[in-house]
Amino acid sequence: MAYISLEHVVKRYKMGEVTITAVDDITFDIDKGEFVIIVGPSGAGKTTVLNILGGMDACDEGTILVDGKEISKCNSRQLTTYRRYDIGFVFQFYNLIQNLTALENVELAAQICKNPLPAEEVLRHVGLGERLNNFPAQLSGGEQQRVAI
């Protein structure tokens, strides 16, 4: 069984009289540990698919399973819990709090986790042990992204 499974997923956006189909009957599976790249032209629905998988939007039709949990049937409150505890999402523009250190940014995020790991240990694990007390402006883009992850 796939870790992530999308079956016949459809997403439409309605704006007044106009309906735009952003995702039209897509089906694919991703196994646990598999590395996947989603590519396509502008407007193909890549961001919409990721927003649905990340629990930030819902599909209009179809079934989405993540680790056996059918997120396509989740209500708003359940999606919030899913986003908070079950999935990680790092945006292209990850907004770290600029007046907090790398360590403080991770400690802040850990406050909403069920079983957070020690922030200092996590940062050391991703190669930022010497940068704990640096502010985002003092970190490279890649280092900032590791803090966000």
What is the predicted function of each stretch?
Residues 2-149:
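ABC family nucleotide-binding domain
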